[in-house]
Amino acid sequence: MIISSGNDYRAAAQRRLPPFLFHYIDGGAYAEYTLKRNVQDLSEIALRQRVLNDMSALSLETKLFNETLSMPVALAPVGLTGMYARRGEVQAAMAADKKGIPFTLSTVSVCPIEEVAPAINRPMWFQLYVLRDRGFMRNALERAKAAGCSTLVFTVDMPVPGARYRDAHSGMSGPNAAMRRYMQSVFHPHWSWNVGLMGRPHDLGNISKYLGKPTGLEDYIGWLGSNFDPSISWKDLEWIREFWDGPMVIKGILDPEDAKDAVRFGADGIVVSNHGGRQLDGVMSSARALPAIADAVKGDLAILADSGIRNGLDVVRMLALGADTVLLGRAFVYALAAAGGQGVSNLLDLIDKEMRVAMTLTGAKSISDINADCLVQAIKQGL
């Protein structure tokens, strides 16, 4: 198969993965309206073409939290990444490191902090949920700090798990789920050998380290389900802010008032995100939410954005709408599932190329030049 775009990686991943894994990463909440709008709204944003501007000296380099990034992209935290390729978190982190961008390790990764951090040269980021088990949270923070993680990404849009109906149909959950997953794996021998067998252990490494025993997929569902905390408030984050002395980013902001609260709290950054359409269906796409949030807090903290970003054009669009940097989630997991770490490297190079074309034809010589002036006026006013 010829790979020429991010969509090609999605198609390749669908062929290679057992359905329960493909649909877990590909699906969203409820009827998946927000999942679709994330992609569609971004694709409908018209860039303003400018020509004859001598674009020979063009740079994608940017700075964020005292780190230099080769382009304004980081890999987002994605749970179970190690189920999509053999020791998938390590492979993805190495690809990000090679490209000169941050990798964010999920709380519910297969590979633990202690396995991923030594595999790369630059400090990785670590993502954490607010959970009832505060002992686990403190343990994870201590281990992240000891491993040299530079930035904490705190996910706040999961006080309860989203209703992901596709998971019940695919075998990730629902009746006879374990048997259905086993039967699917039989018909995907490449994955079964390369990941299912050679990629062991399939523990949720960060949780296993804390509990002192292996945890499999069923444990993941049960332990997390009992630990989500709907009582969380900004006050619950205060001890974390005091404990963590590095940059702290609040992930899951969709409203300008919440963004202002993050500034008052003392966050270093926010991620404008609807969790990739996986939590509450019917909320605004990140692209639609971003401009008002940028108007409210631009300059007070770093603004990151995710959800719906599939290519370099989408990165430029998000930056023009007010983001400083974007996070890639599904896009890199598709590439990882299709072709391992090399697939992620190829995807990042493709995004780099797509960004350069878009910047050249919008007259933006640097990342700081990408702003609302790069958008068609009607789009700026009526997104």
From Swiss-Prot:
Looking at the record, the residues that make up the FMN hydroxy acid dehydrogenase domain are 1-380
Question: For this chain's UniProt record, which GO biological process terms are given?
Answer: aerobic respiration; lactate metabolic process
According to its UniProt record, where is this protein mainly located? membrane
Which UniProt keyword terms apply here? Answer: Cell inner membrane, Cell membrane, Flavoprotein, FMN, Membrane, Oxidoreductase
* The reaction(s) this protein catalyses: (S)-lactate + A = pyruvate + AH2
Listed Gene3D superfamilies: Aldolase class I (3.20.20.70)
The UniProt annotation places substrate binding at Y24, Y129, R164, R278
Look up keyword Cell membrane and say if it applies.
Answer: yes
One Gene Ontology molecular-function label: L-lactate dehydrogenase activity
Give the bilayer topology.
Answer: Peripheral membrane protein
Primary enzyme class: oxidoreductase
* Cofactors named for this entry: FMN
Q: Which domain of life is it from?
A: Bacteria
Subcellular location(s) of the protein: Cell inner membrane
Q: Which residues bind FMN?
A: 106, 127, 155, 251, 306-330
Q: Single GO cellular component annotation?
A: plasma membrane
Active site annotation, chain numbering = H275
**Cell inner membrane is among the record's keywords:** yes
Recorded E.C. number(s)?
A: 1.1.-.-
Q: Which HAMAP family match?
A: L_lact_dehydr
Q: What does this protein do?
A: Catalyzes the conversion of L-lactate to pyruvate. Is coupled to the respiratory chain.
> Which family does the similarity line name?
Belongs to the FMN-dependent alpha-hydroxy acid dehydrogenase family.
Name listed for the protein in its UniProt record: L-lactate dehydrogenase
Give the source species: Acinetobacter baumannii (strain ATCC 17978 / DSM 105126 / CIP 53.77 / LMG 1025 / NCDC KC755 / 5377)
Primary gene name: lldD
